[in-house]
Amino acid sequence: MIRLVAVDMDGTLLGPDGRVSDRNAHVIRCMQNMGVELLICTGRSYEDALLPLEEAGLKASVVCMNGASTYDVRGRRIGKVELAGTQVEQIVECCKDADVIFDFMTDKGSCTIAEEEAFKDYFNRNVLLPMAEFSYEGVRRRFTFLPPGELFERGLEFYKISVIHESPLVLDGLRERLRAVPGLAIASSAATNLELTHQEAQKGKALAEYAAMRNIRRDEIMAVGDSENDHSMLSMNLKYTVAMGNAVERIKKTAKCQTRPNSQDGVAYAIENLVLPYAINSE
């Protein structure tokens, strides 16, 4: 019997409009009423992960920023893994000649050292790929724009850094350079970004730690995702690892099975077929 369902957000639980569909929300509530836990595993910050959950009337524990921070269902932080200051310095140095946009996720929210005009241009050309439910002004309000010289003067704790560029080829080159940074995990959630965390801050590791705290075995877990930053949890030896129908090929090859795309309530379909029948029979 499945006791824990770990679900990515963007491209997975959320539809193309950036919202939890009525069907997904209904099926998740049915699952929770049967005693099965929902664990959100997302690249978003905790605050940004809560927005669509609250809109849908759902509550869940949340692994955020690709595993850099974990919150329980009451909103209490129960785990965090920061990037070291030397890692952040090396990341900035590796990317300094590539004309990238940085999104630094910190204990004080998101900040960037980009010029605002360049930032807005990337948004307007769909390079920034913000959360679908946000307008430019909504995204702009999330960020503090810092002069480059102030980045290391504010005593910030860095949890995740997104490196954004319109050219996948440029990002491929940066990925190779960044491999030289010790202890760095490199993932991606889109063709125009790299997502950087400490190597101990990955969705799979955070999922394993959460399950251990809850005394849930790996054969009692189902995980669902769509992009490269879900690989660490979909490559785990769980009862079910499920790729969305819209998932990238690497994820489809990694997962044990495949569900419908996020535009067709793929999370609900997976839960209805792999979780609810057995939860019902166990009552």
What is the predicted role of each segment?
Residues M1-L4, G15, V20-S21, R179, ...:
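Mg2+-dependent phosphoryl-transfer enzymes with acidic/Ser/Thr/Gly-rich catalytic loops
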Residues C94, A98, M105-V224:
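Conserved acidic, metal-coordinating active-site core of Asp-based
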Residues G35-L39, K59-A60, K160, D219-I221, ...:
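Short active-site oxyanion
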Residues N24, A49-L53, L174, I251, ...:
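Hydrophobic packing residues within well-ordered alpha-helices of enzyme cores
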Residues M31, T42, N66, I161, ...:
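Residue-level signal for inorganic ion chemistry
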Residues R3-D8, I40:
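Short, hydrophobic/glycine-enriched beta-strand segments
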Residues D22-V127:
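Active-site phosphate-binding/coordination module
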